[in-house]
Every structure is written in structure tokens, then in C-alpha cells.
């Protein structure tokens, strides 16, 4: 099956090994890992950055195997979850960057298309998050207000 925004098929890539329990060499102290996650979040890191730091510095290859909870669940329990999900935030930042570029280079037709694609992805994600209850009902993406939301 082809990709949605490209004329190519999906490519094979590496797959994480299937495990039901954490490897014996990994750090498996759940309370310590949760404390580290909270500290890293308070330092301003996103969930993906927290996962990378845990993997590289603290020998935790998979937080869910070590603690039984995902990083987002740990942050939600502690009240540190961001109001905009990380994947949506990243796409909104990308769309705003393209908009700024097009304000100076308004004849750049290739990036006009990239803006359409990025904003389509944003709208699709917003629909999903509103439907699943992660974002409030009636929330819509508006480029004018997105920059204000991202600076908070």
C-alpha cells in the first residue's frame, strides 16, 4: 500500500525486539525511573527526549517494560502532561516554519504544497485527539493562534 503524501510504498526498517520483560542488564527500579522521568520533564524535556535520555544515560531500553507504564502515563499521573500532544506540537511548529518561509518567498510553490500537507496532517491529528478526549471538544487548528499556543 502506498503512502498518503508520497508516490512510494512503505520501506522496511529495523524493528524493536519483542520482549515481555526487561533485559537483566537494564535498570528496573520503577520508583527511581519515575522520579527521573519527572525530573527530566521539569527540566523542560519532551516525552521523546526523556526516552532517549533514559536509554542512553540510565540503561532503560523500554520504560513500559521496566515500570509497567508509558512515559506519558507517568506524566499524566503526576500532573505534568503537556496540554498539546508532542506529535501535534511538532507538526504545528513545522507548519508555522513553512508559513514564515512563504511570507518572505511567496512564489515558492513546492513549499506551498508542503504547507498544505503539514496542515492536513495537523487537522487529521486534531480530529483524532478531540474524538479520543485528549483535546477539548470544538478545538480547531488556526495558524494565527497556533504560534501563541506554542510559545506557552
Curated annotation (Swiss-Prot):
Annotated keywords: Ribonucleoprotein, Ribosomal protein
Gene Ontology CC: one annotated term: cytosolic small ribosomal subunit
Residue stretches of biased makeup (Basic residues): 1-10
Pfam families: Ribosomal_S13_N (PF08069), Ribosomal_S15 (PF00312)
A Gene Ontology BP annotation from the UniProt entry: translation
NCBIfam families hit by this protein: PRK08561.1 (NF006331)
Assembly mode: Part of the 30S ribosomal subunit.
Family statement: Belongs to the universal ribosomal protein uS15 family.
Protein name: Small ribosomal subunit protein uS15
Source species taxonomy: Archaea, Methanobacteriati, Methanobacteriota, Stenosarchaea group, Methanomicrobia
